[in-house]
Amino acid sequence: MAKNIQAIRGMNDYLPGETAIWQRIEGTLKNVLGSYGYSEIRLPIVEQTPLFKRAIGEVTDVVEKEMYTFEDRNGDSLTLRPEGTAGCVRAGIEHGLLYNQEQRLWYIGPMFRHERPQKGRYRQFHQLGAEVFGLQGPDIDAELIMLTARWWRALGIAEHVSLELNSIGSLEARANYRDALVAFLEQHQETLDEDCKRRMYTNPLRVLDSKNPDVQALLNDAPALGDYLDDDSREHFAGLCKLLDAAGIAYTVNQRLVRGLDYYNRTVFEWVTNSLGSQGTVCAGGRYDGLVEQLGGRATPAVGFAMGLERLVLLVQAVNPEFIASPVVDIYLVAAGAQTQSAAMTLAERLRDEMPGVKLMTNHGGGNFKKQFARADKWGARIALVLGESEVADGTVVVKDLRSGEQTAVAQDSVAAHLRTLLG
């Protein structure tokens, strides 16, 4: 007997019972994006490796440890995308979307990182991201955060997420801070673990989000990034905070928040939760005004964010279980009798024409009424339509509300209107 082939570790199947809630959550997210004027862009999952090295930074954990990189038959180095911003910028440059234009784009799809699989974090994971190009003021940063806050309200999780903000300043301000931080860390190398010692010279800002408690205690005495901000960045951040205050969005300024990718400048933010065990990030982003030029385009201000959908689904299920998936079907058509199958299928097609979007399933495979009603329950149907030989003969159909048990005979010509009333 041949050995079963199983899914790769950290790359999951999502079965019909799970995908229904994914679809409802994704639908909510997409509706909000549309209400803010964002358009979808669809991007390849494989890109040239230099794209990510240039965008993310060669000494980041993502590039050094986590990317799935391989050579194709032509000897070109390709990588499964570990994040979406770099590909979105590449597409914007390649297709001329960014030159002297404002763009508001969103994307959704699988990303890939070779890291240890754990709850809510997998090697293939799904991400929704939004990017804005051509706007440089704090007002668009604030609107992006307002958009995400609207998501949390729509999903019923607003009380379970909190916003952390920081400004990491301009490239020049960050370079000055980097020198001060390295000088401080050099004086306390005995407290640093090996990972922090390596990062101290390659990417010292990443030491700030070390999970090592000894390092975290040491950083209480480290220079503060906020003390090194340039005047423009201070003004930008103050403007952002003022707009969020006016919108009633609570936040905490976290001066250790730096994000893990090299392309960020000025605004960075994270929405975090404590409702999944240890604190976890639900959504994160910031401003990256230099990335378009870095990847070969003209200098273009940009800001965006990304969100891991696996963690979001877990959070919604944990704190708002009433946000249940829509039923697989609204209506199940039960047919019994040798002469009813053709009439049932004809009625089903007519109802699909008259009720666009209705989820209607016709029974196939025979079975008595008891078995067919059991199938209707299995598929989560709200209403059963019962068509027997007598109903076919007199042009009626029995409409049964499977929640209340009430049923009534309705003329087939008017059943669509009756169903609309029942389904609301």
Curated annotation (Swiss-Prot):
Pfam families: HGTP_anticodon, tRNA-synt_His. It is an enzyme of class 6 (ligase). HAMAP family: His_tRNA_synth. Gene3D superfamilies: Anticodon-binding domain, Bira Bifunctional Protein, Domain 2. The keyword Acyltransferase does not apply. It comes from Salmonella typhimurium (strain LT2 / SGSC1412 / ATCC 700720). Homodimer. Changing P117 to Q/S: Decrease in activity. Its main location: cytoplasm. Its EC number is 6.1.1.21. Belongs to the class-II aminoacyl-tRNA synthetase family. One of its GO terms (cellular component) is cytoplasm. It catalyses: tRNA(His) + L-histidine + ATP = L-histidyl-tRNA(His) + AMP + diphosphate + H(+). It comes from the Bacteria. InterPro entries: aa-tRNA-synth_II, aa-tRNA-synth_II/BPL/LPL, Anticodon-bd, Anticodon-bd_dom_sf, His-tRNA-ligase, HisRS-like_core, HisRS/HisZ, HisRS_anticodon. It is found in: Cytoplasm. This is Histidine--tRNA ligase. Keywords: Aminoacyl-tRNA synthetase, ATP-binding, Cytoplasm, Ligase, Nucleotide-binding, Protein biosynthesis. GO terms for molecular function: ATP binding; histidine-tRNA ligase activity. GO terms for biological process: histidyl-tRNA aminoacylation.
